Amino acid sequence: MVRWQLHGRSGYVPHERIFRDVYLLHRPEQCIEDYFITTDIHGSTAGVAVRLRYYDSAVATRITLYDAAGTIVGSVTPVEAPDDAAFPYHAEITIVDPTLWNAEQPYLYTLVLDTPCETITDRVGIREVHVANNQIYVNGQSIKFHGVNRHESDPVTGYAVGFEQTKKDLLMIKKHNFNAIRTSHYPDVPYFYQLCDQYGFFVIDEADNESHGASEYYCEGNESWPNHVENWNKPIADNPEFTEATVDRTRLCVERDKNRPCVIIWSMGNESAYGCTFEEALAWTKSFDPRRLTHYESAQYRSKNRKYDFSNIDMFSNMYPSLESIQEYLDNEPDKPYIMCEYSHCMGNGPGDLEDYFQFIQSHDGLVGGFLWEWCDHGIYKGKMPDGRGIYYYGGDHNEWPHDGNFCMDGLVYPDRRPHTGLLEFKNVYRPARVVKYDRESGMLTLHNYMDFVDLTEYAALTYQVSCDGEVIDNGFIPYPDGFTLPPHSENALPLAVHIPDKGKCFLKIFYHCDKDLSLRSEGHLLGFDEILLENEDSRNQKTLAMWSDAPSNSTITVQETDRHLTLCGKNFTYNFNKLTGLFAAMQYEDAVLLDKEMEFNIWRAPTDNDRKLKLDWLAARYDHCMTNAYRTEYQVTDSGVTLRAKVGIAPISLQKFLDLDVCWTVSNSGAVTLALHAERNTVFPELPRFGLRLFLPKEMARVSYFGMGPMESYCDKHHAASHGYFSSTIWQQHEDYIRPQENGSHYDCDYVQLDGAGIKLTAVGAKPFCFNASHYTQEELTEKEHNYELHPCDSTVLCLDYAQNGIGSASCGPRLAEQYRLDDASFDFSIRLIPEKA
């Protein structure tokens, strides 16, 4: 065995030794050495051309094409083609009314090459691909890539990924509505492509060219990005000494995979800059295979010293672009379509911008889609925790160098292929169809089909569900009317009459189910759903309204005051209020302790991986070490209870105050506690991680029920896999166990949440929808620990009631969080009510 390279890094944990199958194949002395299958479509016919090359001399060969049912379509004998030095024998079979191959309908013919001493069988997909009008067309249809980057990686076997492992990945990828894969950053095992042919994926096949790490050593002491770009290509990409090596790697990729219909784009490599070596690789590729498209993102990284040839590149590619930068490109009259070879970095809790990218992709023809980074976390399995969860190491945990820490934990699935919530988010964002509108008066439901090739009626069955204040009040099957069609990229309306109550928060959900057993997705498989808020006379949650009403009470509250505290005593409760912080230090209801420690105004969250740049600003502002001080506190006893008012400031240790709060607490005679505050923020400080209340409840309060977006975690920019409803679970089930601990488990757009246990219940209800998080881990613990197996639960149930959280985004390796998701309000109001009850 000859080692291919001495050193190499492609963005994930390095391994050694042989990791691909090595085999010896005994063949006849005279046989077919190689063949190249191409297809052409001519109206209602198609041609399947086979070019052959023999070892030594030609042998008698019969080429037969079968359809998927096993019927012979055509059979021919190759003839000599002396003008073709590479493949000097040709054959062609013409098919009338062919069934074409695409990612949604991966129809395959079988080609058999018979010689006296052996038989070779291959599968053929008839398809064409070309660029026109800055769009990519397959079989004459403009397509969008809903793609993902995929490394070959397994937590136990490393790079050695077998057939069943590959099949499992592709099964999951297909079930979550992807239609394309980029083989980052090298050609995959051969059976990967055969499975992609069969299951239906468009593939960008990438040659094993990468010099990202090496480029860092040639910046001549200037680490600025412009200097990096200017000098990146000098040592390798624009150095003629590397031309043969670069072309050789490209040639090996192209020649091996040339017969796979799933491959529609050849990629020259990754992050290697541009120069003469890649000009030659592209020219060779286009000469050898002009029917496919070419891609190379690093073409934009070159020096200004000379003109470069980009004529053999079919698209402009970029990584992690902002929507603004894409718009700038499209506004500049480009001559190539725009493709995002990597976007929406999926590291940890994220990504949070998938819906925004989807809307932009669909509304701009020149943007042909993209490929998420990336499929899986590259953790190394190291055994199990006592509770059975896996222990996974990442960069540096083996004391190796160099490494990128947990930057290899950047996938949509955990190392063992459990889905991240980001994968569920993608699945529903890229559902096959969407509701355009629902007209209550006419009872007509308008749908848009986002498929590229298939009529929705041939693919998806529809069901519906109507809920009111969290209770399902109607559901059923939606039949397609006679003659109804919904072709790709079109809209149509069908009838759906539902009963909508006059009062209550009502939602209509439309579910899309796989109509038959298609491409790994069994009949009934949920493809996605829509949720529509239904208008009625009073769309407020009626249960929430009732929680804001106090039951009549003849009891009163007495107040005892000291220099530091106010003690409020009611019929069945005692609350201790800290005059120095403007917060309750202790709460006891029906002889049950509600607070293990003083509640807090809370602005910190355990930084997500997507906060890794922003957290530097947060730490500089010392948001993780803040003090709360009340400057003036007063109270008033009324017939209905007690009102407490305080002027409160929040400041980091040794820095100036950045939040001024006008706080009003109202305690009713029944023991309900209502907070209403107005906040003014010093906008010199960075956006807030969050703002809200943090309560430390007894750990026995270990069950949570809520009306909001669930059941999985949800955030202001990451909630499309969730839906509104009433949900109930344990506190442990709320935790999303990311390999590197971080903020997780929040729920967005909630009306109320209730925790109970040990004979006591506490309900929090918002004047407006709020966010909450309930956990046995503190945000400090999640911030401090580097691995999930290092986490220790606290002795309380931690309940965070948030006015809002900063969005999630994908800034771990992408643009800054979009402005509309930043918690940077100059002022805001927040009101929430706490209602204790005996269980």
Language-model-detected regions and their locations in the chain:
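Glycine/proline-rich low-complexity spacer/linker segments in large multi-domain proteins
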Residues: M1-H26, A103-V112, F511-E535, F691, ...
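Intrinsically disordered, low-complexity Pro/Gly/Ser/Thr-rich segments with frequent PxxP/GP/PP motifs
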Residues: P78-V96, G470-K503
